[in-house]
Amino acid sequence: MRVLSVDHVSYTYPQQNMPAVNDVDFSLERGSYTAVVGLNGSGKSTLARILCGLLDADCGEVSYASGVRSALVFQSPKDQIICSVVFRDTAFGPQNLALPPDEVELRTIESLAVVGLLHKASSPSVTLSLGQTQKEALAGIIAIDPDVIILDEALSMLDPDSKNDIFAFLSYWIRKGRTVVHITHDIDAIRKAQDVIAMEKGKIVYSGTTDDFFTDTELCERITGEKIVKSVFKKNNKNAMKFSAVSNMPDAEAARRTIVC
């Protein structure tokens, strides 16, 4: 089932001559994981903002299937932190969906457990490290359970173990039928994806499977700016970690509290 269609979308920033996004056209299916890749200035972050409605395209159309909800996780996590305490901030989204208090609490605990911040639930947000703040922002998005999640370099500040935990969750999430769009230039992140959309100067120059993208070494190196060793590449999800049920977390009960924001 198609969840997102991008129909010949273009966007030029005010007082700029060249479009940041130029005649971009693609569609995404439910349960897919697509990496949107390119060097700085290629237009991928601008595209992310158009997909989430933060920017209006000059021409073309972005359309979601009926009832589909999308969410964006920014590269700078502080742009998304609203409340002063980690638990309250993560609960903010579910609360504004008018969910029952028990459901808000459950989603908040599960989301913090997924990103490895359950032990920081009662901590002030300002006391977190930059990497932990990025996890907090991601937890807040996970808690609203969007159908499409757009990650704009949102894992760039995480350590390798934390990244693996998030990738494991995303793999589980995709199996539930959710769709992931990952704006990135990180080779490891690209390898986790099923498909790749490569951008240069605002245009799509490649759209296809991850395997085929890495097979075209010249294109891959030009788009990522990295030297690619073919023998190192492994097909997607080979290293995916198994998702651990949140109910098994020993400190989950300790995080339960009255949610006020």
Model-assigned labels for residue ranges:
Residues V37-L39:
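The feature captures the beta-strand-to-loop junction immediately N-terminal to the Walker
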Residues P124-L128, Q132:
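Conserved ABC ATPase signature
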Residues K203-E226:
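Conserved beta-strand-loop-alpha-helix hinge in the C-terminal portion
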Residues C52:
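Helix-to-loop junction immediately C-terminal to a conserved catalytic motif
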Residues M1-V3, S10-D23:
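A short, flexible loop at the N-terminus of ABC-type nucleotide-binding domains that lies
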Residues D102-K120:
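Conserved ABC ATPase "signature" region
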Residues I183-H185:
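H-loop/switch region of ABC-family ATPase nucleotide-binding domains
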